[in-house]
Amino acid sequence: MNEDLKVNLSGLPRDYLDAAAAENISAAVSSRVPAVEPEPELVVNPWDIVLCTSGTLISCENAIVVLIIFHNPSLRAPMFLLIGSLALADLLAGIGLITNFVFAYLLQSEATKLVTIGLIVASFSASVCSLLAITVDRYLSLYYALTYHSERTVTFTYVMLVMLWGTSICLGLLPVMGWNCLRDESTCSVVRPLTKNNAAILSVSFLFMFALMLQLYIQICKIVMRHAHQIALQHHFLATSHYVTTRKGVSTLAIILGTFAACWMPFTLYSLIADYTYPSIYTYATLLPATYNSIINPVIYAFRNQEIQKALCLICCGCIPSSLAQRARSPSDV
């Protein structure tokens, strides 16, 4: 039959029918082809960026201290061993914060979560324990001033280092070995995957160590005041000079202890009273100051030390400034 004789029973224009047929064919074809869903955009929490930045600063600062102490054979006294332990712990803490950011957004898995939280717990525990060990060492160096540099003191320092790192590693292994809340979210603390009980143990341990440090620093203040008074009498210093020296020593100790408490106390108390149901912004707001303590530690304990300052100057410019070479240690340098 001739095409011109075909009857259009629908009464619609032929162009419209051709277009409708094309749309039907296109719809049928597209229904057989699976739709490609767009990949979800990676949304990064600004708090995680701040924590990662903090971890980077921590790592850079403390890496310098570790390298100075490791490469300088003269820095092998008990005090420098403990400062090196503190710097190494803070260095690992900074690395833990960086790896936590990388694994959270690039390599998400249960294994990476457990390894990262284990590293962070172990390193921060070692950092706090090293601060306590430094406080003990300072107390012993003042209380047993005549016998402090004996072989017995070096042995005691190594025993403290083994104990504090052994305890810290054990605390870090607890989440990895199974004490976590990955299978039961109701037991989670403010920091997943730590359990509420695990966080409580860490918080109570911190409060106990803080109480010990407070007691030791009170005793150190008494010894410093007594030594400063004796030096003033021997050298016929004025009373105002004795007062200024004592005040500097007490102020230094107050700054050290106050900084430590201000950094760690908010997160410690929050971990005791809160759980996983609380908004995460509170966890970030209290955890971030705790990381600042690892940024401040090298300034307080390492870069203020004369010997480390000399070693750093030798590395950077190959000479020791006359102000460092001639500076005498005073009772306020505690």
Swiss-Prot record:
PROSITE patterns: G_PROTEIN_RECEP_F1_1 (PS00237), G_PROTEIN_RECEP_F1_2 (PS50262). Its main location: membrane. A lipid is attached at C317 (S-palmitoyl cysteine). GO terms for molecular function: G protein-coupled receptor activity; phosphatidylcholine binding. The modification Phosphoserine is found at S330, S332. It is a multi-pass membrane protein. GO terms for cellular component: cytoplasm; plasma membrane. Residues 70-77, 135-158, 221-252, 304-334 are cytoplasmic. The chain crosses the membrane at residues 49-69, 78-98, 114-134, 159-179, 200-220, 253-273, 283-303. It is found in: Cell membrane. InterPro entries: GPCR_Rhodpsn (IPR000276), GPCR_Rhodpsn_7TM (IPR017452), GPR12 (IPR000599), GPR_3/6/12_orphan (IPR000723). Glycans are attached at N8, N24. Pfam families: 7tm_1. Residues 1-48, 99-113, 180-199, 274-282 are extracellular. Keywords: Cell membrane, G-protein coupled receptor, Glycoprotein, Lipoprotein, Membrane, Palmitate, Phosphoprotein, Receptor, Transducer, Transmembrane, Transmembrane helix. One of its GO terms (biological process) is intracellular calcium ion homeostasis. Belongs to the G-protein coupled receptor 1 family. Promotes neurite outgrowth and blocks myelin inhibition in neurons. Receptor with constitutive G(s) signaling activity that stimulates cyclic AMP production. This is G-protein coupled receptor 12. It comes from Homo sapiens (Human). The gene is GPR12.
